[in-house]
From Swiss-Prot:
UniProt GO cellular component terms: cytoplasm
Subcellular location: Cytoplasm
Gene encoding the protein: argG
Species name: Streptomyces griseus subsp. griseus (strain JCM 4626 / CBS 651.72 / NBRC 13350 / KCC S-0626 / ISP 5235)
Keywords carried by this UniProt record: Amino-acid biosynthesis, Arginine biosynthesis, ATP-binding, Cytoplasm, Ligase, Nucleotide-binding
Pathway: Amino-acid biosynthesis; L-arginine biosynthesis; L-arginine from L-ornithine and carbamoyl phosphate: step 2/3
Gene3D superfamilies: Argininosuccinate synthetase, chain A, domain 2, HUPs, Single helix bin
Residues holding ATP: A8, Y9, S10, G11, G12, L13, D14, T15, S16, G117
Name of the protein in question: Argininosuccinate synthase
Keyword Nucleotide-binding in annotation: yes
Single GO MF annotation: ATP binding
Subunit structure of this chain's protein: Homotetramer.
Length: 397
């Protein structure tokens, strides 16, 4: 029986060429799998037909937008996930979604190998292959760009030689990856970290410097899940989409950073994530109102580790699953409304309301009605600072 390879297919030049390239290099039949995580662009059926025209023996497309939002983006919102305190894991979250569909297709079609289009220099090769090995330990992985030196020039030459039905124009100088949770731009002139980004690289966000009227929005959460925008019920996907549009129109969610890649190098990345940043900002503030202090302090440590694990491609690891359980428990009381003003590139919280609130006005106020017993403060301070006081007596003697 002829071996089969499942290919993560985007519909672009590189993965279209990879179909024939893999067949020639390995003698295997190729099954192309395209997964829609809200990246936009061409119709899925057009992509499916192109894969078949390029030589795939089977081609599958999956509309995974709701799955991606609910099973991958939502946990990131609950975790307030910002890698290096800034990056909302736009690309890292989509990879396990795609991996899940690739492994399912491999089982369905009896394939023993899964292929992806990543280079040998980035994080995504690790995310794909670590995920595939976790869900299908028996499956092999190949990466034509990395393993067979399939450069873009060679891909174009192959495409023209085989007369494949895809444009062979030189691509943009940038490497772009996008989904409903955000957009990542790298390479080109951005590799010089002194160069400022130009406005042309942005698509999800308007120029925040352009004067415009501010937009006020109320986001409602139930146990950490966004359930309504301005009082109208939404799914998680709809919440992200609506905030992408509204926050993006105000220039919210632009990030320009040098980040530590898993492979050991530093890389300059420009991100747009208007919906993600607005939702995480709102969720984080609602946690400030509803989560007990010690739990909140410890959760911040968990959030950092959770984000690092997802960035590093360990979505399916035992520790990640255990941290999910902690984060879900910590979100049990994160229910209420957050009012935000979206304007000039910022999402600013201006109001909070929750039946689960731990904010006690009578304890917090300095005006009449204050119920905080200040007479207990002195004794508390004496006990609280006693250890340091004893040490100081020794050290200053």
């Amino acid at each position: 029986m002829t071996e089969r390879v499942v290919l993560a297919y985007s519909g672009g030049l590189d993965t279209s060429v990879a179909i024939g390239w893999i067949a020639e290099e390995t003698g295997a039949e190729v099954i192309a799998v395209a997964v829609d995580v809200g990246q936009g662009g061409e119709d899925l059926d057009v992509i499916r037909k192109r894969a078949l025209a390029c030589g795939a023996v089977e081609a599958e497309v999956a509309d995974a937008r709701d799955e991606f939002a609910e099973e991958y983006c939502l946990p990131a919102i609950k975790a307030n996930a910002l890698y290096m305190d800034r990056y909302p894991l736009v690309s890292a979250l989509s990879r396990p979604t795609i991996v899940k569909h690739l492994v399912a297709a491999a089982r369905k079609h009896g394939a023993g190998t899964v292929a992806h289009g990543c280079t040998g220099k980035g994080n995504d090769q690790v995310r794909f292959e670590a995920g595939i090995s976790a869900l299908g330990p028996d499956l092999k992985c190949i990466a034509p760009v990395r393993d067979y030196a399939m450069t873009r020039d060679r891909a174009i030459a192959f495409c023209e030689e085989k007369n494949l039905p895809i444009a062979t124009t030189r691509k943009s100088p940038y490497s772009i990856d996008q989904n409903v949770f955000g957009r990542a731009v790298e390479t080109g002139f951005l590799e010089d970290i002194w160069n400022a980004p130009i406005e042309d690289i942005y698509e999800y966000t308007a120029d925040p410097a352009v004067p415009r009227e501010a937009d006020e929005v109320v986001i409602s959460f139930k146990e950490g899940v966004p359930v309504a925008v301005d009082g109208r019920p939404v799914t998680v996907l709809q919440a992200i989409q609506q905030l992408n549009e509204r926050a993006g129109a105000q220039g919210v969610g632009r990030i320009d950073m040098v980040e530590d890649r898993l492979v050991g190098i530093k890389s300059r990345e420009v991100y747009e994530a208007p919906g993600a940043i607005a939702l995480i900002t709102a969720h984080q503030e609602l946690e400030n109102v509803t989560v007990e202090r010690e739990l909140a302090r410890y959760k911040r440590q968990v959030e950092q580790r959770w984000g690092e694990m997802v960035y590093d491609g360990l979505w399916f690891s035992p520790l990640k699953r255990a941290l999910d359980g902690f984060i879900n428990e910590a979100n049990q009381h994160v229910t209420g409304d957050i009012r935000m003003t979206l304007h000039a590139g910022r999402a600013v919280v201006t109001g909070r309301k929750s039946e689960e609130s731990l904010y006690d006005f009578n304890l917090a106020t300095y005006d009449s009605g204050d119920t905080f017993d200040q007479s207990k403060a002195q004794g508390f301070i004496e006990i609280f600072g006693l250890s340091a006081k004893i040490a100081a007596r020794r050290d200053l003697a």
